[in-house]
Every structure is written in structure tokens, then in C-alpha cells.
């Protein structure tokens, strides 16, 4: 009877989120929304403020222990990853979410005001970046997907760590700090990161590294306190793209345009800006909403 009850609760939670059968869709954004402490999907193919197409909240997910739900407050990043979404919150927790069910597949805890997450090769392996603890942390959820206290983890120092991205082409992890971008080698068998090279972007972008995003062609965009910078891993060179202040997230897309969130109040915004060539459209405004980051799903 208990198993039936849990399944029923899961179905109710998924239906409440409007998530049943939802899939990654072109032209949709996934966003971290800090007023409701939720992850939401938005149809961004046209300007305006449509209703959420999908939503996840830890407090409505029966797989999240009641005492752990508050550690998902202040979601700070989210990324579509196959049929899942990876999310992390400034209060310390992260999760892999199923788009189809609207429920967590696994979750864990890293602390230190985490700002970014990426999947590593290997079952249930993740890397995170935390700005207050100045660290990149690797975590395995494989054996204990819903028990953060039992999950092995290792932390590596990186000043004001804000971004992490796995590079499948080069088989390495990139991590963004306050003034530098670090390349790490990953060993699944040893559960170990090894720093390979450190790139200083201050001559081009100044300090304040905040967001790290793939450009879709093998390179990366970096946002700093004052500008948008492009990094070419093959040449090991940074290039100034545009002077944009306080960009929390930047997400390029050749079809739909380049989406970004920028500070309007404290560190939030009630809208997402999308630019394609000389054209600009606004997704929003949503009065009272507190977007932190937003990224294209596809």
C-alpha cells in the first residue's frame, strides 16, 4: 500500500507541475526563477509573457526529503541535458530532473553558494561550481541518488568559481573563476580532477567571471562584470564580443537568437532578452518574477 501511495503522490506532483510527457523543444527556454524557487520552461519563439510550459519545485516533489526542500531555494542555474534538466540552487542543493515526469531523478548537496552544474562521464557523476567556498566539486549520486549525506564528493580550489561545462569533444572539464578559465582532466575510475591549464582572461574581459556557455561550435562564451567574451580552446585565446554589464547568463542560438538575463533589481530580472541581428524581443515582463538565469533548451 505504501508503494502505491508514493506512486500516486508522484503522479499528483507531476500533474500539478503541468509536466506530463513534456520534452525538450526548439525555441523554448529553461529558467531559474527565484521568487517561487522553481525551474520553468517558457515558449520564447515570440515576444510576450506566455504561461509556463513546464515547472518544477522541490517542495512539490515527493522524492525530495521534506527537510531538504529549502536547500533548493534561490535556484542559480539550469541546463537542458538530453531528456533531463540539471539544476542547482544557491542554498546548496542540486538535482537532475526528468522533463517527462517533472520529478527529480537524483539530488545532492554541495553548499558554498553553488552557481553552476554539469554532467561528467559516468553514472550519476556531476561537477559543480561554488562562489563562496571558492571551489569546483565533483559528486557521485550513482549509489545513493536520494541520500546526499552518503554521496562521495571532492572539492578543488578555484577563486569565486561560477561556471562549469563538460567538453565532450576535448574530453575535459572547463571551470570559470573570478579571473581565469581552468581546464581539468577527469578520471572516472579514480574519481579525480587534474588541472591541465589555466587561462587568464583579465587582459580582455577584466575580472568577475560569471557565466560559462558553449557557443555550439566548440568554443565558449564568458560573461564578466563588464562584458561578453569569446574563448577559442584551439587557439587558447579570448576575444571581446560586446560590452554588456551584469549579464547573469548568456545562451546563443543560431535559429532563435542569443538570450540573456541582466540585472534589473538586486540580482534578478523580470524578463529575458533575445537578440538576433538587429532585432530584439522581450520574453516578459512577468511582474514580480525573479529570473536569475535562462538558457535555450535546444
What is the meaning of each model-derived region?
Residues 66-79, 111-119, 159-165, 204-215, ...:
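Repeated scaffold domains used in trafficking and secretory/extracellular systems
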Residues 25-27, 82-84, 122-124, 169-171, ...:
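Short coil/turn segments that connect the beta-strands within blades of beta-propeller domains
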Residues 56-85, 89-92, 102-116:
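Blade-loop segments of beta-propeller domains
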Residues 43-49, 140-146, 185-193, 233-238:
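Short loop/turn segments immediately following beta-strands, especially the blade-tip
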Residues 31-35, 86-91, 127-132, 173-178, ...:
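Conserved beta-strand positions in repeat-built beta-propeller and related beta-rich domains
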Residues 22-46:
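An edge-strand/N-cap motif at the start of beta-rich repeat modules
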Residues 52-69, 103-108, 148-156, 195-203, ...:
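A short beta-strand motif characteristic of beta-propeller blades
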Residues 10-18:
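Hydrophobic h-region of N-terminal signal peptides that target proteins for export
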